[in-house]
A protein has these predicted regions:
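N-terminal accessory segments that position/regulate proteins before the catalytic core
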Residues: 1-465, 476, 480-525
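Short surface loop/edge beta-strand patches of beta-sandwich-type extracellular domains
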Residues: 473
Length: 525
C-alpha cells in the first residue's frame, strides 16, 4: 500500500486497513508491558505520595522522588474488573474483563508505549534504564555517560550536562496491532501524545523543566536503548532539568549521521518477554516508521509558527465569560479520571464551566523543538464541537476562537442525532452528552515540513491537548472519553473544514456522568 494511501485510509476509509477475515487472537495477546530478563534491577518505592505538591525547583530529585514521577506518568495505578453481558436474551452469558489501568487513557487499555530513562542521579549508577511498570522498578540496560552522544543525536541543540534525566517514549508496534491491525498506527501516535502530556503535567508539579524533542536521529537513539526498529522505536525525547532546557540554533554546516554515531557504542542484546507465541507481521507500520526516520541532522527543520484561526469561520460570535481560576491537586484528579461511556448523564452546563474548560486546555503550552524560538508555543490545532444544553449558548456546531476567547457558530440546532449516527463504534450514548468536541488539524499532517514524520508528530500534539482537556474536565467534575470510532468525513462536512484543508483528528465527548459500577483497587502502598 502506498504510504499516502495508508495515511488517507487511517482517517477517511478505515475499512480498507483491515483484512476481510481479521480477528484478534485474544488468547495470544501480548503483555501490556515489556519485561527484561537477567538484568540488574533497582526497586522503586511503592509508597508514593497521595498528593502532588510543588517541590523545591532548585534541587535535583532523589531516586525516591524520581520514582514518584515515573509512577504518576505511566505506572500501574489501578486494577479493575468489569462485567459484560454477551449473547441473546434467551441465552446470555456474563464475562469479566480484568485490566491493569494507568492514569493515562489508551485505546483498548493496551498501552503501546514504553519509558526509558538516561539517569544521572547520586543514588544510582549513571546510565540507561527501562522503567519496568509491572514491578515499579528500573532495569539497568547500559552504564556510562552519554551526554555527548545524546546531544549529537538531538542536533547539538541542548546542553544535556545540565539535565539530570532524559526520558525516551517509545512505541512497541505489536502491543496494539494484534487487536487493531493497521489502525493501530493512528492510536500509537495519540497514545504517545497522551503520555507526553501527562509527563509534562507531572514534571511541572515536581518543579522540573522540560522540552519535548520530536526531531532526533532515530537509529542512534534506538541503538543506545538496544531497540530493534522492526519491533519498537522511540517517538519522543524529553530532557528533564532543574534549569531551563534552552535550545540552540541548528548548525547547518555540520551534519551528524546516525550510522556513524551508532558505531561509538556497542550493540545491546538483551532478552525480553511479551507472552505472545505467534509473531504477526505489520509491513505497513514498518515501512512508514522507516520513512519517518531521520538519518542525518540535515533533516531537522524549524517550521512556521501557529497560524491564527481564520475569523471567516462562523459569523455569529458568543463571547465567553472570564474563566474561573482553578487550582487542583493533580494526584486526586488522576485518581478520579476515567473514560465514561454509558455513564454519561445529561445535565445543563454553565457557560463559565465551558469557558474555563476551553481556556485551561489551550492556555497550556510547552517547550518543543519545532520552532526556532525560546518561547513557549501552543500547537497548530483548533477545537470544534457540537453544543447542547449549554447555558447562554444556542444549540449547534461551533469553533473555539482562541484569540478572542469566543465561540463562532457554524450551524444551528440539536446535532446529537447527527453525532450519534456518525459513530462507527457506538459505545457512547451521545444523546446524554452536552459537549462533543473535536481536535482539528491540517489534513496534510505536517508532511510538507516534516515528511511522513509529521503525521506522528501531529498525532502526538493532539494527544497532549487531549490529556490536558481530560484533566481539566475532571477538575471541573465532568468526564471525557477520547474516541476514534467516528466518521471523519461527516464531522469535517458539518464543520466545513474541508475547504480549509483541515480534518478532525479525534473526538472527545465531555459532560457530567454517574458513578460507574465496577470493582477496582489501587496499586500503591
Amino acid at each position: 500500500m502506498e504510504l499516502d494511501t495508508f495515511l488517507y485510509n487511517l482517517h477517511f476509509d478505515t475499512d480498507k486497513l483491515l483484512p476481510p477475515d481479521w480477528q484478534p487472537d485474544w488468547e495470544d495477546a501480548p503483555l501490556p508491558y515489556k519485561l527484561y530478563r537477567g538484568l540488574p534491577e533497582i526497586p522503586l518505592t511503592a509508597d508514593v505520595p497521595l498528593t502532588l505538591k510543588g517541590r523545591e525547583a532548585n534541587s535535583i530529585p532523589s531516586l525516591e522522588e524520581f520514582g514518584h514521577y515515573l509512577w504518576y506518568v505511566y505506572g500501574l495505578t489501578r486494577y479493575s474488573q468489569a462485567a459484560f453481558i454477551e449473547g441473546t436474551e434467551e441465552k446470555a452469558t456474563v464475562s469479566y474483563a480484568q485490566l491493569f489501568r494507568r492514569f493515562v487513557p489508551s485505546g483498548g487499555a493496551l498501552y503501546p508505549n514504553e519509558l526509558y530513562v538516561y539517569l544521572k542521579l547520586e543514588d544510582v549508577p549513571e546510565g540507561v534504564y527501562h522503567y519496568d511498570v509491572a514491578h515499579h522498578r528500573l532495569i539497568f540496560l547500559r552504564e556510562g555517560n552519554y551526554d555527548s552522544y545524546l546531544s549529537r543525536s538531538l542536533g547539538n541543540r541542548y546542553n544535556l550536562s545540565d539535565c539530570f534525566c532524559t526520558v525516551f517514549v517509545s512505541t512497541v508496534f505489536g502491543k496494539n496491532f494484534y487487536k487493531y491491525n493497521n489502525f493501530s498506527y493512528r492510536l500509537q501516535g495519540l497514545d504517545t501524545g497522551v503520555v507526553i502530556g501527562q509527563s509534562l503535567e507531572v514534571a511541572d508539579r515536581m518543579g522540573f523543566s522540560t522540552r519535548v524533542c520530536y526531531q532526533f536521529l532515530d537509529r542512534s537513539i534506538n541503538h543506545l536503548l538496544g531497540l530493534s526498529e522492526q519491533d519498537e522505536s522511540v517517538y519522543a525525547v524529553i530532557p528533564l532539568s532543574i534549569y531551563n532546557v534552552d535550545q540552540f540554533n541548528i548548525e547547518k554546516n555540520i551534519s551528524i549521521s546516525a550510522t556513524e554515531l551508532s558505531r561509538e557504542v556497542p550493540m545491546l542484546k538483551h532478552v525480553t518477554y511479551n507472552r505472545s507465541k505467534r509473531v504477526i507481521d505489520y509491513p505497513e507500520l514498518k515501512e512508514i516508521n522507516k520513512a519517518s526516520m531521520f538519518e542525518t541532522t540535515h533533516s531537522f527543520v524549524n517550521i512556521k509558527q501557529d497560524i491564527p484561526l481564520n475569523n471567516a469561520l462562523g459569523t455569529e460570535l458568543t463571547i465567553l465569560p472570564f474563566p474561573e481560576v482553578i487550582s487542583y491537586d493533580l494526584a486526586s484528579v488522576c485518581r478520579e479520571r476515567h473514560s465514561p461511556d454509558i455513564d454519561f448523564m445529561l445535565g445543563k452546563i454553565s457557560q463559565t464551566k465551558v469557558s474555563t474548560l476551553l481556556h485551561e486546555t489551550f492556555s497550556f503550552s510547552y517547550q518543543k523543538d519545532l520552532y526556532n524560538t525560546q518561547g513557549k508555543l501552543g500547537t497548530g490545532l483548533n477545537m470544534y464541537g457540537t453544543f447542547y444544553n449549554v447555558e447562554g449558548v444556542q444549540d449547534g456546531a461551533y469553533v473555539y476562537d482562541k484569540s478572542t476567547h469566543a465561540l463562532r457558530r457554524i450551524s444551528k440546532g440539536d446535532l446529537r442525532e447527527y453525532m450519534q449516527n456518525s459513530l462507527t463504534v457506538p459505545n457512547v450514548n451521545l444523546f446524554q452528552v452536552p459537549l462533543v468536541l473535536h481536535v482539528v488539524g491540517d489534513k496534510d499532517h505536517l508532511k510538507k515540513e516534516l515528511g511522513y514524520r509529521g503525521y506522528r508528530i501531529q498525532q502526538m500534539e493532539a494527544g497532549i491537548l487531549v490529556q490536558r482537556l481530560l484533566l481539566t474536565a475532571c477538575a471541573l467534575e465532568m468526564g471525557g472519553h477520547p474516541l476514534l470510532g467516528f466518521d471523519s468525513n461527516q464531522s469535517d462536512e458539518l464543520y466545513g473544514v474541508n475547504s480549509k484543508e483541515k480534518t478532525c483528528l479525534i473526538q472527545i465527548p465531555v459532560g457530567p456522568y454517574r458513578p460507574r459500577v465496577w470493582l477496582k483497587g489501587s496499586l500503591n502502598s
